[in-house]
Every structure is written in C-alpha cells, then in structure tokens.
C-alpha cells in the first residue's frame, strides 16, 4: 500500500477569506478531508487516525464502495457499531447514536457527550449526572468510519464558504467544520443516502490512560490468533517514530495533533 500525507493548513481557504489573527486551531474534520482532494480520484473511506476498527469493518466498507455508484442521490455508507462494543470501564465517552430507517439507511446521528457503561448496557446524562437515560447495549453508534464517493469533496467545498461566513462572525478562533455536519446537510436536503453497515466488531481506542493496557492486550491476542502478522511493516519502530517533516525521531510526535484530523484511505477500484 502506498502511503501519502496530506497536510491540513490554516491558510487553505476559499478566495476572499483570510486566517483570523490569533487563530492556531485547524478548521475541523471536513476541512481535513478537503486537504486531501488532490490525492483522491475515486471512492474513499475515512477513519479516525488513532482508533482500531476491526478487519471486518474495512471489508464491509470496501465491498460497498466497490459496487455502489451515485444515482439521483449520493450513495454513501457508514459502519455502525454496537454501543456495548465501544465503551470503557474507565469513564464516560461521547458517541453519536444513530437513527436508522427500515431500509437500513441513516436518518440522523444524535451526539451524546457523556455516556457511561452499565453492565452490558449504558446510560447518558445531559445534566452533569443529576439524571440518566438508559441506552441498550446493542444501540447502533457511529465511530466515524465513513465511505464516500468522490462527489463528497465538492459538497465539502460548497459548504465551507457558508461555514466560514457564519463561524468567523461568532467564533473566529475556534469554530470547526465537522464532517458529520456535511452529511447531515445532505440528508436534510434529500441529496444523499447513507447505508448503515452493521458490524459486531469490537472497537478499540485509548480514551483514558487506563485504557491502554486493555487495548494492548486485545491487539496482542489478535496477533497471537493470526489475525495480523507480528510485524506489519519492514521497520515498525522507524515507522512509528517517523515525524511528518520526514526526519526519524526517538519519540512519536503526538504533539502534532497526530492529524487528529482524519486519516483518509483512498480505495482504488479495479473495474476491469
């Protein structure tokens, strides 16, 4: 697999806009994808750079993008995880709870910022813990594994101007252009359909420092069960410590926001 890096630059703005004085924060996840537009010439998938999604989930998104094309509407996909497979014992998490219609299409995503684990189920609070609402463990949530056609890039660019005109007035130093907001706009305007691809995969991420040992153990078991080779690349240590300036470093450069933006995996389809 060929790996290329796209850099999210503050000054990458439409004509007529300038970076506000004092702004250091990047423009958000939708803008991160826009930063990759010159590298994408077909369907593509988007993931969080520092999460583990499971092999089955990648196959699902690849299979979908291989056979689906836009028609009168954009045809997108999202892998939906069972809430119980995304929780931690070490504190609360934020999750996007999915509303799905009878045809398996996404209707909306409702963000809950404080969800806690309760056995095999969960509950969320919106009043700092004064009250909780139960959530079933098999509730479907979005973990930001999306599949898009190339046309999504045009829609991001189209909405970016409107975002800037409003955001720069109200919160010029911190406003962010989020990927889900673009999807929501297209769903609300009936321009897109998003197929929810259900998975029973376990999602792993280090939300809290205390999560790290559990995640390391889980990934080790996958290796021992031959899900993955023991060494994923020729020089694993060098790959892990390769900083974006192209210089080998002794420490992993987490301070760079690690493209906290999103990693974009471009899926080139062989249609011969």
How should each PLM-predicted stretch be described?
Residues 157-161, 165-191:
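A C-terminal functional module that forms or caps the active site or interfaces directly
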Residues 55-145, 150:
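Conserved core of the sugar-phosphate nucleotidyltransferase
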Residues 140, 195-201:
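Catalytic beta-strand/loop signature of glycosyltransferases that borders the donor
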Residues 1-48, 53-60, 66-67, 249:
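Conserved N-terminal catalytic core of the sugar/cofactor nucleotidyltransferase
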């Amino acid at each position: 697999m060929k790996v290329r890096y796209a850099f999210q630059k503050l000054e990458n703005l439409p004509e007529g806009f300038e970076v506000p004085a004092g702004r250091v924060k990047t423009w958000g996840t939708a803008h991160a994808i826009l930063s990759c537009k010159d590298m994408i010439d077909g369907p593509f998938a988007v993931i969080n750079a520092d999460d583990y999604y499971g092999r089955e989930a990648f196959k699902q998104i690849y299979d979908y993008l291989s056979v689906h094309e836009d028609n009168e509407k954009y045809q997108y996909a999202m892998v939906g995880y069972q809430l119980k497979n995304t929780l931690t014992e070490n504190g609360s998490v934020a999750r996007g709870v999915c509303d799905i219609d009878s045809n398996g299409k996404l209707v909306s995503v409702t963000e809950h910022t404080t969800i806690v684990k309760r056995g095999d189920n969960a509950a969320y609070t919106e009043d700092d813990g004064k009250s909780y609402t139960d959530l079933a463990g098999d509730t479907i949530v979005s973990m930001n594994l999306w599949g898009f056609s190339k046309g999504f890039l045009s829609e991001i660019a189209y909405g970016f101007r409107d975002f800037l005109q409003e955001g720069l007035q109200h919160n010029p130093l911190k406003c962010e252009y989020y990927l889900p907001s673009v999807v929501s706009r297209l769903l609300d305007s009936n321009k897109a359909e998003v197929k929810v691809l259900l998975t029973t995969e376990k999602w792993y991420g280090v939300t809290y420092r205390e999560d790290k040992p559990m995640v390391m153990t889980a990934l080790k078991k996958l290796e021992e069960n031959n899900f993955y080779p023991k060494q994923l690349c020729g020089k694993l240590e060098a790959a892990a410590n390769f900083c974006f300036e192209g210089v080998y470093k002794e420490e992993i450069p987490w301070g760079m926001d690690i493209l906290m933006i999103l990693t974009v995996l471009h899926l080139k389809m062989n249609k011969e």
